[in-house]
Amino acid sequence: MPRALLCLLLLLPASAAASGYADLGKLEREAVDDALALRGLQIEPEPLGRIIGAVQVVNLDVFLARERVPLVWANIFHRTTREHHVRRESLLQAGNRYDQDLVEETTRNLQDPSLSNVVAVLPVKSATPGIVDLLIVTRDVWSLRLNEDFQAQQNYLLYFTASLSENNLFGWRKYMAAVFVMDQGEMSLGPNYSDPNILGTRLKLEAAFYWLWKRDAGQFNPGPHEGTSSRFHLEYPLYSLASRWGAAVDFSHFDGVYRRFFGTDLFRIPLDGISRSICNPGPYDPAGVPWMYRLKAINTSEMVTRSFPRPSVIQRVSAGHELALLRPSFTPDFPYADGSIERSQFAQEVFPLSERISDLFLRYELFTPRYRTYRDLNTFDFREDIRLGPSLSLKAGRASTLIGSDKDLTLFQTSLDLAADWWGGLQSVGGSWEARLAGDELTDQLVRGRVTLATPVLARVFRVVAAGNVAFLYENRRNRYFVEGGDTGLRGYPVGEFVGCGAEFIGHVEVRTMALKLAFLRLGGLVFFDAGDAAANAQSLTFYDDVGFGLRLLIPQLNTYALRADWAFPLRPAPGMPAGWPGRMTFGFRQVF
């Protein structure tokens, strides 16, 4: 340990744990030590109740010499976040009384994986007796970058996105990028912009626009131009738990071609005159018609929220308006003429319900403002805050032709989740229900259940994490369906392998190691088990499962999420995948669940 750092630690009072220092992770503690040494500060052991004299901000460089990263010179090309932009995000300012709950909330608010990999807020001794100062320590991730994310299996790229971006424009915490996205059937390119503080206010803006082109299977050259998509979000957020008013406006549109895939090929269905539905479109037929159609979709919402905060529980009531427009149609190259039986059969089997729903809604939310900080759960060493206790949401809306809807109906959405941290782990269970009521008929019921379990770190070496989801559709008038496969977490099977419009389940168990530090890198491994299926009803579900192993690599200076490489082996054969060797390899970012 360097002598200067050792001397600094000796100066820290034994009660530093009461100020939060002892709860910091390794990367955070190193950053705080750097900041204390840089400013000549000491932790204040007894800050509670004192008036804050000043809010000091230290934002460290991306690359530090002590980490022996051969890129320290690159710091000259990065503009660290300006101190006053960090300072104004603090819920505690000079003249306020020190409050540990607001310190924790400020830390959570400042956490943004695209901007910082370290955020720590601590009390420090002030030069004025009886006063305490607040120290905010952050460390930027590299912002001028070519961001990438991808999913691949063997030699086929399923999904790829790249953006030439400035994630922290001029150090103002604003994001601007040109974004390219490629999935199995489409390529898109367009500008993105995000501003969390418009003109220094609390207003938040996110906007994006994309031009769409066709992608032929396995090709990297764009095909014909097919349409556009966009999204726009303007919000006055509930920026603290004590905030009482919030509002938001959203708009999105899609005008392009929707495709369904079977593995790496377009799913094809036979148009043989046999009456079927979207729940039973018939088997994959290599000589059939490709599952693709043109889709125009528009979604808008306007909402005002009133919050009723109390120390033990937060209640919120929201009211607003929503518009959802969905119009499917045939592509120009559909092989059958207007009025043909084949067209009618294809529309019946493939198209979602064409509709325009305009509704006024009321929503009630309740949750407990209690949080726990985890580490080495979904990433390595970084702080991960999870809210504990109950979380309830009740929503009802009334759609009417008087406000532009093409039908009169009532919409319901409910959800309830419970999270706990017994024995130092994480336990979360929840469920949701949504439905439509038209007259006295209840339709389109969607019931979901979910569970997440995580042990504490065992023997300082590993953690066991499990998750499961189950869902059922009843009276499915909107032609919705479930899809399970390699892109939804069933890693041993191809994309879109299992489809059903009545029931689905997916479950995972992983044994994840703690990180091994290799110079400035973090390396971890895991073994896993997946199981899942989608079918026409619960009775038709089959237990398809796989086992495998994977690696996780984290470069803290560039990302707060890990690079993922998994190799899975199916235990049960499926139409698109034999059991056992050679299995299926996938690559991407972030954990699967």
Predicted regions and their residues:
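Periplasmic polypeptide-binding modules associated with outer-membrane biogenesis and secretion
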Residues: 19-158, 162-166, 177-195, 215-232, ...
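Short loop/turn motifs that connect adjacent beta-strands in outer-membrane beta-barrel proteins
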Residues: 45-46, 169-175, 197-205, 239-247, ...
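Outer-membrane beta-barrel pore domains and translocons
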Residues: 58-60, 149-153, 165-167, 179-183, ...
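C-terminal transmembrane beta-barrel domains of outer membrane proteins
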Residues: 90, 390-593
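Feature captures outer-membrane beta-barrel proteins of Gram-negative bacteria and organelles
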Residues: 160-169, 187-207, 230-238, 300-306, ...
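Outer-membrane beta-barrel translocator domains and adjoining extracellular loop/strand segments
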Residues: 188-194, 217-225, 229, 235, ...
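Transmembrane beta-barrel wall of Gram-negative outer-membrane proteins
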Residues: 191-330
